[in-house]
């Protein structure tokens, strides 16, 4: 039975925007967060203000390792899931997926601000102050791993285990093509409109038939906005300064084509 959830603590009680040790800093913050089922896990947040990127990593209750990399310089967001395989059903030890989408302004705090975050009480279990709506994304385009560095240099490292399973959306591809990206790195995947017999994997009974797979993940806690406080000097002039962060939680569901249901055994009717 799930116990009562603790109210979110104000960010100002535990996070401080400390000065950076140098002009470009790498920093890591580890926070304890509560998963939807009530379990507590540790989430790692890393920021590199030099390359202008951040990375968040946490383990789901089912053992899957979820990583979100935000590349501010290229306006690219990379989700990676390392999913434990079902060995008794012929799967490998783990399965890797990468979902690449456009990073919009103000989705998450800048890397420079993330690198400054410090925690006053590391044992406290964090809970997001704001729950942002579930985003359901149709990942209808495959990304060529060998050419993906043009999109973001982080794809080479983050998606190394998912070379044949990197997905994005056609609407994001249009945005990147307008920025001058090479279109040869993208391949449009089959859809139900192209193949009338193409089913959702959870409805497909043949493990060797192609289908549309769904995978859901949630970033349970991340700094989504900066908070500003006001101060007044001796002359009475009011000025604003950064004094903390607001935390958010957001869930995602990705739909994408797989050549056989064997690659999507978690998506079954229960």
Swiss-Prot record:
It comes from the Eukaryota. InterPro entries: Oaf (IPR026315), Oaf_C (IPR053897), OAF_N (IPR053894). Pfam families: OAF_C (PF22873), OAF_N (PF14941). Residues 1-24 form the signal peptide. The keyword Protease does not apply. The keyword ATP-binding does not apply. Belongs to the OAF family. This is Out at first protein homolog. It comes from Gallus gallus (Chicken).
């Amino acid at each position: 039975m799930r116990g009562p959830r603790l109210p979110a603590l104000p960010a100002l009680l535990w996070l401080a925007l400390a000065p950076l040790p140098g002009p470009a800093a790498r920093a890591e913050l580890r926070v304890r967060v509560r998963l939807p089922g009530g379990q507590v896990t540790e989430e790692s947040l890393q920021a590199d203000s030099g390359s202008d990127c951040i990375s968040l990593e946490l383990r789901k209750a089912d053992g899957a390792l979820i990583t979100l990399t935000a590349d501010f310089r290229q306006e690219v967001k990379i989700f990676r899931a390392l999913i434990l395989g079902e060995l008794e059903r012929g799967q490998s030890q783990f399965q890797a997926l990468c979902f690449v989408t456009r990073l919009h302004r103000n989705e998450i705090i800048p890397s420079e601000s993330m690198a400054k975050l410090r925690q006053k009480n590391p044992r406290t279990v964090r809970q997001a102050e704001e729950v942002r709506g579930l985003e359901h994304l149709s990942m209808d385009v495959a990304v060529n791993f060998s050419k993906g560095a043009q999109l973001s240099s982080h794809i080479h490292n983050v998606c190394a285990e998912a070379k044949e399973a990197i997905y994005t959306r056609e609407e994001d591809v249009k945005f990147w093509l307008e920025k001058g990206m090479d279109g040869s790195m993208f391949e449009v995947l089959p859809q139900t409109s192209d193949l009338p017999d193409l089913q959702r994997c959870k409805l497909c009974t043949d493990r060797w038939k192609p289908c549309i797979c769904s995978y859901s993940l949630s970033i349970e806690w991340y700094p989504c906005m900066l908070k500003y406080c006001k101060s007044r000097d001796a002359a009475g002039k009011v000025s604003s300064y950064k004094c903390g962060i607001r935390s958010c939680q957001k869930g995602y569901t990705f739909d994408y084509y797989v050549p056989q249901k064997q690659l999507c055994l978690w998506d079954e009717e229960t």
